[in-house]
Structure formats: C-alpha cells, structure tokens
C-alpha cells in the first residue's frame, strides 16, 4: 500500500480559505476510508459513519456560514483513539468489556478539537487499555508488519491519509514509536499540557495525551488547539544545540537503527547544527525498572474494580501487568513517582551545564517488527515519558524498506520552541 498525502496545514488553508467545503472534504476522507480500511483496519467499525460525518460537516458549515473568520480546525476530519470518551459513541478501549462499564464524560481534548471546528471521522483502534495486547491494525507501508502501539489506529490512519490529525496517548512509547513505524509525525507534549480528563487511564502518573500529523507544520497547528496556554514564540528560535545521550541508552537500539541515527546526526551537522555527545541516561536500566514498576502498580490500582468484575475478559498480557502491579511495594511506587521529577531535573541540569537545547535519539529500537501480534518495544521512548518532557518524533528515512524516525525532547514546558524547531529539523532529515 502507498501512503497518501493529506497534511493538516493544507487542509486548514483550503477549508478556512473557502477553496473546499467541510462537506466535500469529509466526503473525500470517507472515500479514502472505503479504499483502505479493509486492508489497514485503523478505524473502529461504525455502521452509520457516513451519515453522521455528513451531518456533522453540514452543521459546521451552517454554524459558520456567515463568519468572516472560521475556527482554526474548521471542517477538519479527525480521529480519536478509543480510550477517549466521545459523546454519542461507545468507548471500548480495545477490550471485551461492555462499553457501559467504561462510560464517562467527553474528553477535554476531544472537546477542544470539536470546539475548534473539527469533524470527528471516527474512533481509532487501540491496544487493550493502551497496553500491549494488539488490535487488527496493520502498517500502511507493509501490511505484514505492525503499525506499533498502543495508538495503532491513529498512526496508521494519518499515514494512509484517511485523516490529517488523530489523537493518541503515551504511557511509555505509544505515540512516538508508532509514528516512527508509520512514517508520520508524533507529538507527546509535556506532562498534563493536554488535559487527560475523559480518557480511560492506565497509569495516571505517566499517561500523556498526544497526537499524529503528517508533518511538523501540522503538529504545530494542532498544538495551538490542544495544548493549554499555548504561546508561540514571537520570533523563530535560533538553531538548537542537539544533545545525544549516553551509549548505555542508545545501545538499546539495534545496529541498523543506530547506523540510521548516526546518518541523521551527520545530516544535522552538515546543515549547521552543533551536536554534543553526553553521558546523560547512563543509569537507564534503573529508570526503565522504576517506570515499569510505576505503570504496573498504577494500572493495578486503576483497574481494580473492573478487573474484579470482568477479569475473564482481559487479555493475558494485561492480566500479567495487573498481577505484577499488585506485587509492587507501596514504597517502590512512591519512589517511582518521585523519580519522575528527579529525572526531569537531572536532564534539565545536564542541558544547562552542557548548553544543550534538545535531546536527539532513535524513535524506536528499529523499524516495525514483522507480524501484528507484537507492537514493538517502547524502551527508547521510556525516559522522556518518565520525565514528562515534550517530545516530537520526525520521519528520518528507512531501514529495510520501512520508515524509521528520530525523536527530539526539550525541557519541560518548552513545547512551543520544540515544535518550532521541529519544522527546521524535519527539513534536514
């Protein structure tokens, strides 16, 4: 399958400028859905999708028919990972649990998109409870490979061009990794920069709302709607100094991925970027263990009542997580939660002392694994999630014919500059 171009910025310009109508654009996206969904399975089935989307697009047109200035996402079709509650649609969170057991008020992030004029194209496939048990989604670049997870459907739907923007979430690596596998841009903002209310939780101390677009310009447009108190830089920031973490961390990636990463660093040097090697994350093993304990323990707490009532409907991988979480001592959970800030401070101190503006690292250990029973390893994304720092994943070539990416992480709260830099970095990669 050949991925299809459908960048957010072009859609926004055409819709707000009157070159396309929401009804016509929605029809185009629905035609793309009809063309690819039987192969990719990025969206959840919805019996009356076409009628609902047409009605919603018509309502947006009517509401703004006489408006001189259209809302920022006027008529833009969007996808929403099926852990986000949406009024009028069930939430299953990739599970076999009854929707009424998971029901809740509409997610703030969904409301932000709809208030900005977006049209919901549909819910996207997620692994069970945003953990590892996969759904049916396949990688648009090679249908025999995984799209990654847990935001499998959102990444794949953006890659296929079914829609230009989709919400996801990341508790370990569930935005940046599938973005790398599917050859799109993934954004994990600073922790809680996008509110997580109305989202089925896995580990509240690690859960981040994120999203996917086809390019960095689109990622910046979406951030202006989704991120709280967004303040774009008055002037475009200077080229960032790029820091590279320790080999102890980098060596978690495979040899082919590390070669691709070094090639990307060479491209950045050629383009005038200063690259600084550091010993940051040389204690990655303890960071990994701490984060995994925290996720397991919090998942066990969050799912306690549901698991007691519906334990026989949980996938075995999720059962194992919850059972492991029950065994995590309370003191270890407290230490893990405190460790988030410790890591954030350590990374910030290293950036300050070395004069580094962004960290660069492989966005995954390698390209998408073959098969769809395994969504890949999130280990390269884990420390940035644990620290809660803003991270953007950018496409950076291919390995073995499959997309790979580079992730860039900035200081906590420095989302605005990170996404401004991302547009320049994308042009080099």
Question: Could you describe each region identified by the protein language model?
Answer:
Residues 1-54, 270-273:
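An N-terminal boundary/leader segment
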Residues 18, 29, 75, 81, ...:
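Glycine-rich, small-residue loops and helix-cap segments
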Residues 22-27, 58, 256-279, 304-309, ...:
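Acyltransferase
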Residues 48-73, 80, 99-104, 113, ...:
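Flexible, acidic active-site loops/lids enriched in D/E/S/T/G that coordinate Mg2+ and/or position polar
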Residues 63, 69-92, 119-126, 268:
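Conserved small-residue hinge/capping positions at short loops/turns
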Residues 75, 208, 224-290, 397:
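Gly/Ser-rich, acidic/histidine-flanked active-site/gating loops
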Residues 87-100, 160:
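DPxDG-like acidic metal-binding loop motif
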Residues 105-223, 390-398, 403-405:
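Short glycine/serine-rich loop segments
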């Amino acid at each position: 399958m050949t991925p299809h171009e459908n960048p957010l910025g072009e859609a926004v310009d055409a819709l707000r400028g009157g070159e396309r109508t929401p009804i016509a654009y929605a029809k185009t996206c629905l035609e793309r859905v009809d063309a690819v969904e039987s192969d990719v399975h990025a969206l959840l089935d919805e019996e009356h999708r076409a009628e609902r989307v047409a009605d919603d697009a018509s309502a947006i047109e009517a509401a703004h028919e006489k408006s001189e200035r259209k809302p920022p996402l006027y008529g833009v079709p969007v996808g929403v990972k099926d852990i986000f509650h949406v009024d009028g649609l069930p939430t299953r969170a990739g599970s076999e649990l009854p929707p009424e057991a998971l029901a809740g008020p509409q997610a703030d992030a969904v409301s932000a998109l709809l208030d900005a004029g977006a049209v919901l194209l549909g819910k996207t496939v997620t692994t069970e409870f945003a953990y590892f048990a996969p759904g049916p989604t396949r990688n648009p670049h090679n249908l025999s490979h995984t799209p990654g997870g847990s935001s499998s459907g959102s990444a794949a739907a953006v890659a296929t061009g079914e829609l230009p923007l989709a919400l996801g979430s990341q508790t370990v690596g569930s935005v940046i990794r599938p973005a790398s596998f599917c050859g799109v841009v993934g954004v994990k903002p600073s922790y809680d920069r996008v509110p997580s209310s109305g989202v089925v939780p896995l580990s509240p101390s690690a859960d981040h709302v994120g999203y996917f677009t086809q390019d960095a310009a689109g990622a910046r447009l979406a951030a202006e709607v989704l991120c709280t108190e967004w303040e774009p830089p008055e002037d475009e920031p200077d080229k960032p100094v790029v820091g590279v973490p320790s080999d102890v961390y980098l060596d978690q990636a495979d040899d082919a991925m590390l070669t691709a990463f070094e090639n990307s660093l060479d491209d950045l040097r050629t383009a005038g970027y200063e690259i600084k090697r550091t010993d940051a994350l040389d204690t990655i093993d303890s960071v990994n263990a701490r984060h995994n304990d925290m996720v397991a323990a919090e998942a066990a707490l969050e799912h306690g009542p549901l698991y007691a009532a519906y334990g026989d409907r949980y996938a075995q991988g999720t059962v194992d997580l919850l059972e492991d979480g029950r065994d995590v001592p309370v003191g270890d959970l407290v230490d893990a939660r405190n460790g988030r800030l410790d890591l954030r401070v350590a990374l910030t101190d290293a950036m300050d002392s070395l004069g580094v503006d962004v960290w660069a690292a492989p966005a995954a250990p390698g390209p998408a694994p073959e098969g769809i029973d395994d969504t890949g390893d999130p280990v390269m994304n884990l420390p940035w999630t644990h620290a809660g720092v803003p991270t953007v994943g950018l496409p950076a070539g291919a390995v073995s014919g499959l997309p790979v990416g580079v992730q860039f992480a900035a200081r906590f709260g420095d989302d605005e500059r990170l996404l401004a830099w991302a547009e320049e970095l994308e042009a080099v990669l």
